[in-house]
């Protein structure tokens, strides 16, 4: 950490919770790169100078941004009270946590946009490689499935006549753009693999299983899927094939906002409370209901940022 002694003093005074202290230290680890470039501590910078740093240090959601912003402002205010610290820039307290630009580079706007992204990262569907499983993983994210549930979906859960996936008494859409990849995952009992030395494809049998995410030797796990897709996504970004920085969660929230947007275009007022109630398994109490309302409010604020990014 830059100015480690000062920051460690702040962290100790900020919270006694280990989780919060850990988050603070992670925040300052990210700030170190900027502080070394400036040759100065965060507390000396203006709101404008801190904007780019804050965009990197915080996550995508309103809750994450607000938490990160709270640490930053608390640190600056704390520095103002310390007699051995000078040069604190009070203008930094005017910094805002709202920036739709991040949504432009970390979400997709529509199924067409997602398909374009997947095309830039993975092999074409008709090559019939294992990368159709990777595509399907992200299409299930876009449809709204919980990340762990993806690996529990069976062939019988997929209905191409109604273009839906039925699982655990819920219905998830199959988007036209993703149907081919999903169909190959359901129907093919083999995958093709390209030999790098010859450029020719060989056919490999998939394991006998009812699960969609079946590979050559086993059904893929969340751990192996995250490792494989993270590598492919980073490679595409590094090679300039895309400027998007996506993950399962970012694709998932993109799908949530897209469906809400389609409802809004049909005249339905955006309301995330039914959604947060549906995904929350806790029995209702007054305090719990207030918490759900707050979560719905955060989703709505993020949704507005996502909509703003559509016009940029």
Where are these regions (language model features)?
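Basic, Lys/Arg- and aromatic-enriched nucleic-acid-binding interface segment
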Residues: 116-147
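Short, basic (Lys/Arg/His-rich) helix/loop patches that form interaction surfaces
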Residues: 34, 230-312
């Amino acid at each position: 950490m830059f100015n480690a002694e000062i920051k460690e003093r702040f962290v100790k005074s900020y919270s006694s919770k280990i989780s919060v202290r850990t988050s603070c230290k992670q925040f300052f680890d990210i700030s170190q790169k900027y502080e070394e470039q400036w040759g100065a501590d965060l507390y000396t910078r203006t709101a404008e100078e801190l904007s780019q740093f804050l965009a990197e240090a915080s996550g995508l959601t309103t809750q994450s941004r607000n938490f990160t912003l709270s640490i930053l402002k608390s640190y600056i205010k704390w520095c103002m009270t310390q007699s051995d610290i000078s040069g604190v820039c009070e203008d930094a307290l005017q910094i805002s946590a709202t920036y739709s630009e991040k949504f432009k580079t970390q979400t997709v706007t529509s199924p067409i946009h997602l398909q374009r992204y997947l095309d830039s990262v993975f092999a074409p569907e008709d090559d019939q490689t294992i990368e159709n499983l990777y595509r399907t993983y992200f299409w299930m994210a876009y449809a709204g499935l919980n990340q762990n549930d993806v690996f529990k979906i069976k062939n019988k859960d997929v209905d191409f006549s109604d273009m839906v996936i039925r699982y655990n008494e819920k219905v998830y859409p199959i988007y036209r753009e993703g149907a081919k990849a999903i169909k190959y995952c359901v129907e093919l009992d083999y995958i093709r693999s390209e030999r790098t030395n010859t450029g020719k494809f060989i056919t490999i049998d998939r394991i006998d299983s009812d699960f969609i995410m079946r590979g050559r030797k086993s059904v893929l796990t969340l751990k192996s899927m995250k490792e494989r897709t993270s590598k492919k996504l980073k490679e595409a970004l590094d090679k300039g094939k895309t400027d998007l920085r996506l993950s399962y969660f970012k694709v998932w929230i993109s799908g949530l906002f897209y469906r809400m947007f389609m409802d809004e275009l049909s005249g339905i007022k955006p309301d995330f409370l039914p959604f947060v109630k549906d995904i929350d398994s806790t029995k209702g109490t007054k305090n719990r209901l207030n918490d759900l309302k707050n979560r719905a409010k955060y989703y709505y604020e993020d949704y507005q940022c996502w909509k703003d990014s559509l016009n940029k």
